[in-house]
Swiss-Prot record:
Annotated protein name in UniProt: Bradykinin-potentiating peptide Pb
Residues where Pyrrolidone carboxylic acid is found: Q1
Naturally occurring in which organism (per UniProt): Phyllomedusa burmeisteri (Brazilian common walking leaf frog)
Top-rank taxon, per record: Eukaryota
UniProt keyword annotations, A-Z: Amphibian defense peptide, Pyrrolidone carboxylic acid, Secreted
Free-text tissue specificity from the UniProt record: Expressed by the parotoid glands.
GO biological processes: defense response
Length: 11
């Protein structure tokens, strides 16, 4: 798992 996968990233 990675933080980028966990955090909601805006497009």
């Amino acid at each position: 798992q990675t933080l980028l996968q966990e955090l909601p990233i805006p497009p």
